[in-house]
């Protein structure tokens, strides 16, 4: 199953982009665990830092996430210092898989991968990645025929089968495109995963896929289904599932 496939290893023939920073109290839960939304912010920050350092922030400035995979092998906990490595694990002419590994001074290990789509800043549609950025992507992978395949394609269950939980949006949840920010989706995930300490206690994988943006003024509801091995959440607006998240043991 796609959900269970392993992430690619770090390249041996090239050096990933690296940075480090302290684990901050604003990103941790009451038990000092680095929250999922905190991980999302670190991933966004290193993406921006990487774009600035490599120069493709000027040639390919607008990217959106279609999927994020977060594998928590050993969680990070405050206080600690995080070390982040970012490299390109596959690409095509309009999108790329970006791997980020988070380790720490105290032994944390979190492996992530994001499916990023390059957008035309005028039309908002997927567009061809510039030649210079394609050359950069090719420095850490030989996989140049990346195709999109959903990992979470299960439709949201009927509302009468599972009750919806309202999740009011705030102005601070929006990004420069007017969409709900990636980290804000994981605020909602955090609201529910604390009910599954059995999953959090073991190495676990969280996958979130975005189908359509959620914008200001829309009424977001969360629909959740649990079983012994996993927890799945649908982000529902007017009966339409805009995103799906699933957490399970690794």
Regions found by a protein language model. Give the residues of each.
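Hot-dog-fold acyl-thioester-processing enzymes
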Residues: 2-66, 113-115, 119-204
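Acidic/His-leaning functional-site neighborhoods
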Residues: 165-249
